[in-house]
Amino acid sequence: MLTTLIPLSQLNLPPNLQNSEQIQPLVTAEFASNFVHQTLQKQPDLLAEWLAKFPTPDDCCNYTERLAKILARVPNEEMLGRVLRQFRHRELARLSFIQSNKLATVELVFQHLSDLAESLILAARDWLFQRCCAEYGTPKNTLGETQELLILGMGKLGGRELNFSSDIDLIFTYPDIGETEGGRKSIENSKFFTRMAQRLIKVLDEITADGFVYRTDMRLRPFGDSGRLVLSFTAMEDYYQEQGRDWERYAMIKAKILGEDSQNLNHRYLKQMLRPFVYRRYLDFSAIQSLREMKEKISREVVRRNLTDNIKFGAGGIREVEFIAQTFQMIRGGRDKILQERSLLKVLPRLAELNLLTQTQVETLHNAYIFYRQIENVLQAIDDKQTQTLPTDEASQARLVFACQSYYQQDLYSEKTHWVEHSFNDWQQFMAVLSQYQQAVRQIFNEIIGEEETQANCNPVNEKLAEWKDILHYNIRLEDLSAVLKGYPKVAENDYTEIFRHFSTTFQDWVKRPIGVRGREVLRNLMPRIADSIFKGEDHLLLLPRVLNIVDKITTRTTYLELMLEKEQILPQLLALCSKSVMIAEQIARYPMLLDELMSHRGLTDVQAFEKYQSALQDYLIRIPEEDEEALIDGLRQFKQTQILRIAAADILGVLLVMKISDHLTYLAEAIINAVVNMAWKQVSQRFGVPEHLEADEKGFAVIGYGKLGGIELGYNSDLDLVFLHNAPEDSQTVGGKKEISSHQFYLKLAQKINSIFNLNTSAGVLYEVDMRLRPSGEAGLLVSTFNAYEHYQKNEAWTWESQALVRTRCVFGAENLKQAFEKIRQSTLAQPRASGQLRQEICEMRQKMYQHLSSHSAEQFHIKQDQGGITDIEFIAQYLVLAHSHQHPKMAVWSDNVRIFDSAVECGILSSEQSEQLQHCYTALRNKIHHLKLLRKDSVVDASEFTTERAFVREMWQRLLA
């Protein structure tokens, strides 16, 4: 039969052997496995050995002793790798021969496969330990006892049920901390074993010209790929006690100490340490839901990765048999000690013994499992590849049909074996038998574990969350992420890699943090909601890092995580705010207590009344000792940032209009200016006393706000343009201090101290950037002037642009008499007669200079502030109206803000109401856009297609008034 499937001439056998019936077992082995054929080609001595005597199960023994003899002569790691690979290939080829010729039971084959793997791993470990001790010294604990590297074999290796071409899942550990002795330089035990483990993985896993020994997977260790490669017993115990999850309990059921020795105290201690984590003393029914979630996760992975023809993960497959057994082990293993067993095949009859399953159910599961494992081993032996997917090519299908038609199987309750025969001769019949097994297993699974069609699976939203929950973990894979993101139409495929980078980087950081079991469980449930919400929107690439940064700052504050998870209104509001403002995202990350206020729509948006900012600031600072200057300044910054956050939230959520936003930002700045002046005054006066001309509680000092501050039009990131004035007589001195100085020097030191407070950079950042260049004579002028000197300068020396700047001024700090004195200077200066032609010319020249230096000069873009038709043009129009008409209409000089200047122009008959309203509309629309761009930390530039109507009207008004 075999020769009709693959002619002997294709097997590259010697010509004199091609027609001999005696070599039929060899033909069978080569037919079943390309790997066997390749191994015989590479190792002709093995072929000669087989032709002299074909392999038998008795030849598959003494791996440890045979390896020890061979490795005793190995001089270096390169040779070590080569010898291990050649040994592995010879022995696997031998086992494939035995399997394909049906010389042993299915169970015996994977027991030998497991023993071979264990021997190879331990041989490599022991050789490397000696080499590392020679290089670094011998690792010892504080008692001087030599430490060893213990290796936990997980999964099928631990259960002694390894596949032909399985990965091996390992966890490395060592008993005690300490240092090496006897080396050139002592190193910590952790470094010694980490270096040794890295070399061991390389020896086993690296693909060389000789192939590999075993693909090695370390992801089952604490914290997965992000965790340390080797842990001490203490670190491992701490992890499993504090952070171990149910899926890790599930995995640990099969954990085996490789080379386990009951006389070894370290081996005994490690087993005793892990047992309470895996097996609870009570009946642990809470594990059922965890197991069901794990199975549903795998089922979703089957769909996501198109694994429907996978005999391991598919419905009724290997994994479901394992789930049934391990469910009972997790629930009852602590009480029923006979369930504390690594081998699935040994556990199954014990489930019947405990009446947890019927005899029929156990036999069904046992027979199905053996059939599946025969399929799996045959598939993997073909090309030495780890696969559980049924083949689509006819040659592999024929191999599978032949191998699974009949085989030896061990009896369920004894050491005896029996011959199993299935009545199929082709692929279709094979699939029918396989389907019968799968249906039988699935029925038992549903009876024990429960139906998978839960509400989560029926609800598309919950199903999406479940998919996210499956993949959002420390070992997130781009392949899995891409599969989930395909369900979000607004996410472009080119974005997948960047999204993966954000998640991967974040999770790698989180794995090292003491988040705790409760916190990690909340994160497991919260992150899917965050991801689902973010990727439903347009701005996911901007929003994802902002929100991850917030969550990053609260990972160890479980209360906040729970708040975000339990209060449904928090997440949508948080995403709405963060999508429109980088600033808000950063502030919430810095001050997580603001999350509390997201619980109600009015919470975060409940801004102060205008007149309450000053008292609110006083209340905020009262908790800080007066002598702690830096803490007070830091408090000022925190108060400012918190209040700006509230204003921004009210802006984004539509609670405040644009004019009110600027009002709030301006009054907030005034409250802070008031606090800064008082703080500076106290410090300067404690040293120098106070100017002698002052009455009690007077300061004789005023702060003049220019620009946006003066015009009550501050933005989120506006500087403060300030000028300082005082009313001290020329020959005045200070009194009551440690040192007397002139009053002018006093006010100069006061101004310097105010500047210092504003500019001090603390952990909360700079309070405000302060610009003093608008003072008389600019940077060449005095830092603080008298009222008289200021008036003289404004009326006799100021340039036209300085008079323009004076339009937008207010006294923002000072006693009432000083405010009145300043306003008198301002209005009288603005009301001076001016030649309208010269005024227009000078304003236009200044505007042209600004345009040349500051505009975008782009046909595709529009700079909202500096380009023609933008905010600066509107401001210049308002300033022109004041300077040109205040002499005739004093009312024009009253207001410092543009909107009320335009209102006054209507009252004075200078503008029509329609012109005023349209200018106000243009101004507020452009300012509103700038506000929102600043929240996103973007420049004040938009596409040239925006605001075309507004820009056209502003240019028209410019031509009408100033051309």
UniProtKB/Swiss-Prot annotation:
Its EC number is 2.7.7.89, 2.7.7.42. One of its GO terms (molecular function) is [glutamate-ammonia-ligase] adenylyltransferase activity. It comes from the Bacteria. Pfam families: GlnD_UR_UTase, GlnE. Keywords: ATP-binding, Magnesium, Multifunctional enzyme, Nucleotide-binding, Nucleotidyltransferase, Transferase. GO terms for biological process: regulation of glutamine family amino acid metabolic process. It catalyses: [glutamine synthetase]-O(4)-(5'-adenylyl)-L-tyrosine + phosphate = [glutamine synthetase]-L-tyrosine + ADP; [glutamine synthetase]-L-tyrosine + ATP = [glutamine synthetase]-O(4)-(5'-adenylyl)-L-tyrosine + diphosphate. Residues 1-453 are annotated as: Adenylyl removase. Gene3D superfamilies: 1.20.120.1510, Beta Polymerase, domain 2 (3.30.460.10), Glutamine synthase adenylyltransferase GlnE (1.10.4050.10), Nucleotidyltransferases domain 2 (1.20.120.330). It is an enzyme of class 2 (transferase). Its cofactor is Mg(2+). GO terms for cellular component: cytosol. Residues 461-963 are annotated as: Adenylyl transferase. Involved in the regulation of glutamine synthetase GlnA, a key enzyme in the process to assimilate ammonia. When cellular nitrogen levels are high, the C-terminal adenylyl transferase (AT) inactivates GlnA by covalent transfer of an adenylyl group from ATP to specific tyrosine residue of GlnA, thus reducing its activity. Conversely, when nitrogen levels are low, the N-terminal adenylyl removase (AR) activates GlnA by removing the adenylyl group by phosphorolysis, increasing its activity. HAMAP family: GlnE. Belongs to the GlnE family. This is Bifunctional glutamine synthetase adenylyltransferase/adenylyl-removing enzyme. It comes from Mannheimia haemolytica.
